[in-house]
Curated annotation (Swiss-Prot):
Compositional bias ranges of the Low complexity kind: 1-10, 176-189, 409-422, 612-629, 689-703, 726-747
Name of the protein this chain belongs to: Nuclear envelope pore membrane protein POM 121C
Organism of this sequence: Homo sapiens (Human)
Transmembrane regions: 41-61
Biased composition (Polar residues): 374-400, 468-479, 660-673
GO annotation, cellular component aspect: endoplasmic reticulum membrane; nuclear envelope; nuclear membrane; nuclear pore; nucleoplasm
Disordered as annotated region, ranges: 1-24, 90-200, 296-507, 579-747, 936-966, 1202-1229
Modified residues (Phosphoserine): 81, 322, 328, 348, 370, 373
Domain remarks in the Swiss-Prot or TrEMBL record: Contains F-X-F-G repeats.
Positions of the UniProt region annotated as Pore side: 62-1229
Lineage: Eukaryota, Metazoa, Chordata, Craniata, Vertebrata
InterPro entries, alphabetized: Nucleoporin
Length: 1229
């Protein structure tokens, strides 16, 4: 509404309100005011709502309520009655002109004014802040009468009506006058009174609003509002008559705000008393109003000037104190306390703070002086930040105590030492911290380190003692300190205030946080270790020597290297921090922490203590295992900690539980030590468990971790499963038993749900429920939630002969960690199936099929772990070839940040080295983000592992297209379930694109869940994390691999999984089956996707390239689509899947177009793919489409498992039911 229209409408509405008010005001002083306010509010609402005055209305309502409550009490009723009478008389005299000016509006105000004279006077006085001018309230009355009827009804000013016209102008002008000269009031009155009366009425709510401001202004809450209000009022008053009402409020606000906070009560009293007497007539007069406004302005200006002057002086003092810009830079951090700490340079902040309070200025000055003096020695800006960081690193207590001390009487000495300490000790502190981390991993926190550091190491103690001595007594360490001391004492009082701000202000660096976390983790680890040390000590002592932390590199020859190769330290700071975290658990490997610190998680020997807990040697005396197992989780660290289990290469032969020393030597002895240390990473923690060689007879995987909620069931034979330490993830150690099943231990136990332990070894029980997998069943277990599925190789049981490798390391964790597991296969033929481990968050892990045990290295955020021995690890995206010639290549998994993929080694039959896949495949790509490579692991020849789910559901085992799910589909944390069961690849080498698959394994093994691995969530064997049904399909859509996010197999995000042989699964994001790509990296040997995602399909089909984002994967033949790579045909001739869609990627049945056909909808839809080929396309984001039949396994691949993406629920109902049923079954198991 235009102001005029609004004013007019409001005026009409308010007039009746005014009349009502008049009647009520006259009738009853207090109640009438409240009633009038209510009526005025209603009128205002009606008027304002269309005018977009919702805010004004709220303000009006609040102001009206305030007035109603405050007015009656303010003006005593005797006073109010008296004043009302006086005002009413005055208004009668003054009102005629005012009324005439008002054009009849004044009459209504008169009635209102009559009732609330005293209240008005009080209000005017209180708001104006002057005893005389406040009384001019009658003047406002004239103006206010129109406006006030709505606004001041509570005041019940009968007198208002009398003076209203002139007062109205005056009052209105008052408001503007606060910001502007009296001229406005004088000029505005006549037009406004006459012409804008309706506007004024409309403005009435605003008048209340200004009053509301004044109310807050008194507390000091709304001073800004008052300022704005004044300016706005000045502007608004001309604009709208509302300002007429607001002027009154403005009057009140200025005094309350600056002037009247202390004086308001006095002013109110004076105004109430004086206004009725001599000032009553004056208030009506313009002159009185103007004079009052002028006085207010003068007072305000004076106050402002004073404040500005004080602020300026304070700023000058601060500047002088700081004696330089550097000092000023310091000041904000130290001096300004909380706000200043955020700002590097104090200038503006100081001023702002100064303006806020003189006390703050003084405090700031003192702080700045002390800080500035300190800064003089050091660089001005940087030292302060470093100091802050240092204080945080030393621990809040040290910095804080120093700051407090500074404030204290001896603050100057303390401050100088504190600042000097912060700066000088900072470097030593860092070194010391490092030493402490290595030597004293136990130091709980930066604080603890600070406290301990004095008494702790000589190096630490000397610098810190010096610092402390300085802080305690002002050491004359430097002239600067003396200066600081001198300056500080003068400002000691101020400094008292300052100390807290420095605490707030000191910057905390990521390092500080990391140190604290590490310290806390160390405490946890120490507590766990203390228990486990007794058991673990025997084991731990030897291994430390052997493999230092395993970095990414994995030992080339799995055998000899496992102990040695891993040593490479990782440069990652994150890894180092994790390692540091880990080392504390195995304090003995302090050296490890230093060197291994780099990649502690992986180094098996390092944390022998961890290993034994892990139950390294499964065969070893179970007695040891239990304790270690319990401890096993000592290594587990909660979030940040990473215990590194030492990798013990298990020799084929039994590994003694201690094994590490032995294994270090032995692992080479047998072809497949394959103990890959498994790491499980729970949320942030990684821990590796060394896989201990299993005793030949029984593979027992010791559960790495005990589920948090429930103890894992003990392994059948070992009974090993000690309740793991709390850590959720369990890394199963794989035993590389010769013979019989390899045990894969489920690598990681899902926090929420358990994965079944691999078959023979009941690895760790899932947290919630322990399930043990039947012994024979390929070990893959799928972790539920964690999606760590270790895919143990599906293989394990099949050929007893092959030592089935048991996949080696299991789950890495993931955030970024990949663990590579390689179980080395037993020596020759058997491929080791690597169990794939899912990463929680997406670290993929690779398992090396090859005999060499691969260590899964933990991957930190983007690093891929090294894979199986042969394979090299690729870092980000590079794919690593698996070196292993025959037996199995190991696949390396790389990790993607989100989804990692893990490669499995396919190593097919021993004979067939073929596995080019293994070489390539694994590596294929590691996608930095979520690469997943999985090679399907053929089970041993003769065994077809059949994905439980749809994988190869339709296929007859041995069928050309056995879907050979990658032996592990890596699971993704999110949803990856990890490995798909190994599919049989019917053809050994022949797979057209990739030889990945060992040739036909005759008997299929069923994966526990569906695919070899469970999906974390409910995915089928391959089960994608979320629920992709098909073993092969990834959660999102990749058929094979599960991806929680959608990477099919491994990749976290888009990784697709590789498909078993023909059916390709598509990854959600588009990676093609073979390897999902999280973000795009996928390595599929066969086709490559532009993004790097390719998946190779096992056996025949090549995978098509995956997509990086939306790449879908295509059918078997390896064709890669570039980005979105559509689909490849499958070599087998099985229908190829349709290409996935880049973003959406669904793969559809082979022929169908991505979009057309069932292609998955991108976002959450899922389309079922009809038809054969697996369709399971997944859509990249959330949509997953399950092919309708695919679930059934119609497609050659067997099913497209619909994958579930994050939110997408698209699964075929049948698939979901199956998944649910299977989940239940697995849990029952």
């Amino acid at each position: 509404m235009s102001p005029a229209a609004a004013a007019a409408g409001a005026g009409e509405r308010r007039r009746p309100i005014a009349s009502v008010r008049d009647g009520r005001g006259r009738g009853c002083g207090g109640p009438a005011g409240a009633a009038l306010l209510g009526l005025s509010l209603v009128g205002l609402l009606l008027y304002l709502v269309p005018a977009a005055a919702a805010l004004a209305w709220l303000a009006v309502g609040t102001t009206a309520a305030w007035w109603g409550l405050s007015r009656e009490p303010r003006g005593s009723r005797p006073l109010s009655s008296f004043v009302q009478k006086a005002r009413h008389r005055r208004t009668l005299f003054a009102s005629p002109p005012a009324k005439s000016t008002a054009n009849g509006n004044l009459l209504e105000p008169r009635t209102l004014l009559e009732g609330p004279d005293p209240a008005e006077l009080l209000l005017m006085g209180s708001y104006l802040g002057k005893p005389g001018p406040p009384q001019p309230a009658p003047a406002p009355e004239g103006q206010d009468l129109r406006n006030r009827p709505g606004r001041r009804p509570p005041a019940r000013p009968a007198p208002r009506s009398t003076p209203p016209s002139q007062p109205t102008h005056r009052v209105h002008h008052f408001y503007p006058s606060l910001p502007t000269p009296l001229l406005r009031p004088s000029g505005r009155p006549s037009p406004r009174d006459r012409g804008t009366l309706p506007d004024r009425f409309v403005i009435t709510p605003r008048r209340r609003y200004p009053i509301h401001q004044t109310q807050y202004s008194c507390p000091g809450v709304l001073p800004t509002v008052c300022w704005n209000g004044y300016h706005k009022k000045a502007v608004l008053s001309p604009r709208n008559s509302r300002m007429v009402c607001s002027p009154v409020t403005v009057r009140i606000a200025p005094p309350d705000r600056r002037f009247s906070r202390s004086a308001i009560p006095e002013q109110i009293i004076s105004s109430t008393l004086s206004s009725p007497s001599s000032n009553a007539p004056d208030p009506c007069a313009k002159e009185t109003v103007l004079s009052a406004l002028k006085e207010k302005k003068k007072k305000r200006t004076v106050e402002e000037e004073d404040q500005i002057f004080l602020d300026g002086q304070e700023n000058k003092r601060r500047r002088h104190d700081s004696s330089g810009s550097g000092h000023s830079a310091f000041e904000p951090l130290v001096a300004s306390g909380v706000p200043a700490s955020f700002v590097p340079k104090p200038g503006s902040l100081k001023r702002g703070l100064n303006s806020q309070s003189s006390d703050d200025h003084l405090n700031k000055r003192s702080r700045s002086s002390s800080m500035s003096s300190l800064t003089g020695a050091y660089t001005s800006g940087i030292p302060s930040s470093s100091r802050n960081a240092i204080t945080s690193s030393y621990s809040s207590t040290r910095g804080i105590s120093q700051l407090w001390k500074r404030n204290g009487p001896s603050s100057s000495p303390f401050s100088s030492p504190a600042s000097s300490r912060s700066q000088t000790p900072e470097r030593p502190a860092k070194k010391i911290r490092e030493e402490e981390l290595c030597h004293h991993s136990s130091s709980s926190t930066p604080l603890a380190a600070d406290k301990e550091s004095q008494g702790e190491k000589a190096a630490d103690t000397t610098p810190r003692k010096k610092q402390n001595s300085n802080s305690q007594s002002t050491p004359g360490s430097s002239g600067q300190r003396k200066r600081k001391v001198q300056l500080l004492p003068s400002r000691r009082g101020e400094q008292l205030t300052l100390p807290p701000p420095p605490q707030l202000g000191y910057s905390i660096t990521a390092e500080d946080l990391d140190l604290e976390k590490k310290a806390s983790l160390q405490w946890f680890n120490q507590a766990l270790e203390d228990k486990s040390d007794a058991a673990s000590n025997s084991v731990t002592e030897t291994p430390p020597t052997t493999q230092p932390s395993f970095t990414f590199t994995l030992p080339a020859a799995a055998t000899a290297s496992p102990p040695t190769s891993l040593l490479a330290p990782s440069t990652n700071p994150l890894l180092e921090s994790l390692k540091k975290m880990q080392t504390p658990p195995s304090l003995p490997p302090c050296p490890e922490s230093a060197g291994a610190a780099t990649t502690e998680a992986l180094s098996p020997p390092k944390t022998p203590s961890l290993l034994p807990p892990l139950g390294l040697s499964q065969s070893g005396p179970p007695g040891l295992l239990p304790s270690p197992s319990f401890d096993s989780k000592p290594p587990t660290t909660l979030l940040g900690l990473i215990p590194a289990p030492s990798m013990v290469p298990a020799t084929d032969t039994k590994a003694p539980p201690t094994l590490q020393a032995e294994t270090a030597t032995k692992p080479q002895a047998t072809s497949a030590p394959s103990p890959a240390p498994k790491q499980s990473f729970l949320f942030g923690t990684q821990n590796t468990s060394p896989s201990s060689p299993a005793a030949p007879a029984a593979s027992s995987a010791s559960p790495m971790f005990k589920p948090i909620f429930t103890a894992p069931p003990k392994s059948e034979k070992e009974g090993l499963t000690p309740p793991g330490p709390s850590v959720s993830a369990t890394a199963p150690s794989s035993s590389s038993l010769p013979t019989t099943t390899s045990t894969t231990a489920p690598t990681f136990q899902p926090v929420f749900s358990s994965m079944g332990p691999p078959a023979s070894v009941p690895l760790p029980a899932p947290f919630f429920k322990q399930t043990t997998t039947p012994a024979t069943a390929p070990t893959t277990t799928a972790p539920l939630f964690t999606g760590l599925a270790s895919a143990t190789s599906a293989v394990a049981p099949i050929t007893s002969a092959s030592p089935s490798t048991d996949s080696a390391s299991k789950p890495a964790f993931g955030f970024g960690i990949n663990s590579v597991s390689s179980s080395s296969v037993s020596t020759t033929t058997s491929t080791a199936t690597a169990a794939s481990q899912p990463f929680l968050f997406g670290a993929p892990q690779a398992s090396a099929a090859s005999f060499t045990p691969a260590m899964g290295s933990i991957f930190q955020f983007g690093k891929p772990p090294a894979l199986p021995t042969t394979t090299t690890v690729t870092t980000f995206s590079q794919s690593l070839p698996t070196a292993v010639p025959t037996a199995t290549s190991s696949s390396a998994a790389d990790f993607s940040g989100f989804g990692s993929t893990l490669a499995t080694s396919a190593p097919a039959t021993s004979s067939q080295p073929t596995l080019t896949f293994s070489n390539t495949s694994t590596p294929t790509f590691n996608i930095p983000f979520g690469s997943s490579a999985k090679s399907p692991l053929p089970s041993y020849p003769g065994a077809n592992p059949q994905p439980a789910f749809g994988a190869a559901e339709g296929q007859p085992p041995g069928a050309a297209k056995p879907a050979l799910t990658p032996s592990f589909g890596s699971s993704f944390t999110f949803g990856n379930s990890a490995a798909p069961a190994p599919a049989t690849a019917p053809t050994p080498a022949p797979a057209s694109t990739i030889k990945i698959v060992p040739a036909h394994v005759p008997t299929p093994i069923q994966p526990t869940f569906g695919g070899a691995t469970h999906s974390a969530f409910g995915l089928k064997a391959t089960a994608s994390a979320f629920g992709a049904p098909a073993s092969s399909q990834p959660a999102f859509g990749g058929s094979t691999a599960v991806f929680s996010f959608g990477a099919a197999t491994s990749s976290g995000f888009g990784a697709t999984t590789q498909t078993a042989s023909s059916g390709s699964s598509s990854s959600v994001f588009g990676s093609t089956t073979p390897s999902p790509f999280t973000f795009g990296g996928s390595a599929a040997p066969a086709g490559s996707g532009s993004f790097g995602i390719n998946v190779a399909t096992p056996g025949s089909s090549a995978t098509t390239g995956a997509f990086s984002f939306g790449a879908g994967q295509s059918g078997s033949t390896a064709t890669s689509t570039p980005f979105t790579g559509g689909l490849g045909q499958n070599a087998l001739g099985t229908t190829g899947q349709s290409t996935p869609f880049a973003f959406n990627v669904g793969s559809t049945t082979e022929s169908k177009p991505v979009f057309g056909g069932t292609a998955t909808p991108t976002f959450g839809q899922n389309t079922p793919a009809p038809g054969v080929g697996t369709s399971g396309s997944s859509l990249s984001f959330g949509a997953s489409s399950a092919p309708a039949q695919g679930f059934v396994g119609v497609g050659p691949f067997g099913s497209a498992a619909p994958s579930f993406s994050i939110g997408a629920g698209s699964k075929t109902p049948g698939a979901r039911q199956r998944l649910q049923a299977r989940r239940q079954h697995t849990r029952k198991k």
